[in-house]
């Protein structure tokens, strides 16, 4: 089975073709980073318009790279939510139109399920069950995964997501958009333990997380300290240490609670080098294993949508003709794939 995946939930237009026998056949991606840089963040209306401009050329590119035409496809998957409604509707409209025009089955995919399953695109894939840490600009959650569609949200951020905290703290430090990766680059030059930032909610039972207070603590520290480059690097390092430690503590607690031996890290923040190293060391000490996608599949992409959609289409799940976008869509409400 060969499926075209369409991702347009935020500021990346991602298109891919996935074959259940041969694997990923093509992958095309356009990022809107330069478009939004002057505004310091994503402008929804601009994002939607840019998706409109880029989506059809990228579909043509992905099909050409796979040496295929639309007639060769067995199905179409598009991101249905969560995300920016205007951006979602661009992908949903194009996906539904292609499916209707060429009489192909179509499925709307949950964006975070795509991230959760992104490690399945690699050669070394996790076996069910496992614990998933999903960390991005819009979400931070711990999910118990018994199978595709069999998800239990064990804990999540009660305010800012980890990626959002990275971006907002970077902005406070005067770093250009996108701030998260730039903050991490600055943090690599910092001296560890120069500052002690709090580890929010780690002193309380449960698996929920909070990062807004950490952002406020960073803002106060930035305002009170000198503005030289080394001090800024030390503050960035302390902030990153606090986020990584907090996520690690929550993961360890969740693993103990569930008894799972494997951990999946996915979402944009999963590309963070310090987070990967810390959780890999933790899992080695626990006798388990950690899985994460390659860098290009940590951020939003069409490949993860094609893969997730293929699993559901193979199970006979198909969307009706209505064009739907769901800006909010709880992960644990998805239908299981038997």
Swiss-Prot record:
Protein name per the record: tRNA N6-adenosine threonylcarbamoyltransferase
Residue numbers binding Fe cation: 111, 115, 300
Annotated localization: Cytoplasm
Gene: tsaD
InterPro entries xrefs: ATPase_NBD (IPR043129), Gcp-like_dom (IPR000905), KAE1/TsaD (IPR017861), Peptidase_M22_CS (IPR017860), TsaD (IPR022450)
Keywords in alphabetical order: Acyltransferase, Cytoplasm, Iron, Metal-binding, Transferase, tRNA processing
Biological process per Gene Ontology, one example term: tRNA threonylcarbamoyladenosine modification
Function as written in the Swiss-Prot or TrEMBL entry: Required for the formation of a threonylcarbamoyl group on adenosine at position 37 (t(6)A37) in tRNAs that read codons beginning with adenine. Is involved in the transfer of the threonylcarbamoyl moiety of threonylcarbamoyl-AMP (TC-AMP) to the N6 group of A37, together with TsaE and TsaB. TsaD likely plays a direct catalytic role in this reaction.
Catalytic function, reaction form: L-threonylcarbamoyladenylate + adenosine(37) in tRNA = N(6)-L-threonylcarbamoyladenosine(37) in tRNA + AMP + H(+)
EC number(s) per entry: 2.3.1.234
Note describing how the cofactor binds: Binds 1 Fe(2+) ion per subunit.
Species, as recorded: Shewanella halifaxensis (strain HAW-EB4)
PROSITE patterns for the chain: GLYCOPROTEASE
Cofactor(s), by name: Fe(2+)
MF (Gene Ontology): iron ion binding; N(6)-L-threonylcarbamoyladenine synthase activity
One Gene Ontology term, aspect cellular component: cytoplasm
Lineage: Bacteria, Pseudomonadati, Pseudomonadota, Gammaproteobacteria, Alteromonadales
Positions with a binding annotation for substrate: 134-138, 167, 180, 272
Family: Belongs to the KAE1 / TsaD family.
SUPFAM superfamilies in the cross-refs: Actin-like ATPase domain
């Amino acid at each position: 089975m060969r499926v075209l995946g369409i991702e347009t939930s935020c500021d990346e237009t991602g298109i891919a073709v996935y074959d259940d026998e041969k694997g990923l056949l093509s992958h095309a991606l356009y990022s809107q980073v330069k478009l939004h840089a002057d505004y310091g963040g994503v402008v929804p209306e601009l994002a939607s318009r840019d998706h409109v401009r880029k989506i059809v050329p990228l579909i043509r590119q992905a099909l050409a790279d796979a040496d295929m035409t639309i007639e060769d496809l067995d199905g179409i998957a598009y991101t249905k939510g969560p995300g920016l409604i205007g951006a979602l509707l661009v992908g949903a409209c194009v996906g539904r139109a292609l499916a209707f025009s060429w009489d192909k089955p179509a499925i709307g995919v949950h964006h975070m399920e795509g991230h959760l399953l992104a490690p399945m695109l690699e050669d070394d894939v996790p076996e069910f069950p496992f614990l998933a840490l999903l960390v991005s600009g819009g979400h931070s959650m711990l999910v118990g995964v018994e199978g595709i569609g069999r998800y239990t949200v064990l804990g999540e951020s009660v305010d800012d997501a980890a990626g959002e905290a990275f971006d907002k703290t970077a902005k406070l430090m005067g770093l250009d958009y996108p701030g998260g990766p730039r903050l991490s680059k600055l943090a690599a030059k910092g001296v560890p333990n120069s500052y002690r930032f709090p580890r929010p909610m780690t002193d309380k039972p449960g698996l929920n997380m909070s990062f807004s207070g950490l952002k406020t603590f960073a803002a106060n520290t930035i305002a009170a300290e000198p503005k030289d480059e080394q001090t800024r690097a030390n503050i960035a390092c302390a902030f990153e240490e606090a986020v990584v430690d907090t996520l690690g503590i929550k993961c360890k607690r969740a693993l103990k609670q569930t008894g799972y031996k494997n951990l999946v890290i996915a979402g944009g923040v999963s590309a963070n080098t310090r987070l990967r190293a810390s959780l890999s060391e933790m899992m080695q000490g626990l006798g388990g294993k950690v899985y994460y996608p390659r860098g290009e599949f940590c951020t939003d992409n069409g490949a993860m949508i094609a893969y997730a959609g293929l699993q559901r289409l193979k199970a006979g799940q198909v969307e009706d003709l209505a064009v739907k976008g769901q800006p909010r869509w709880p992960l644990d409400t998805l239908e299981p794939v038997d």
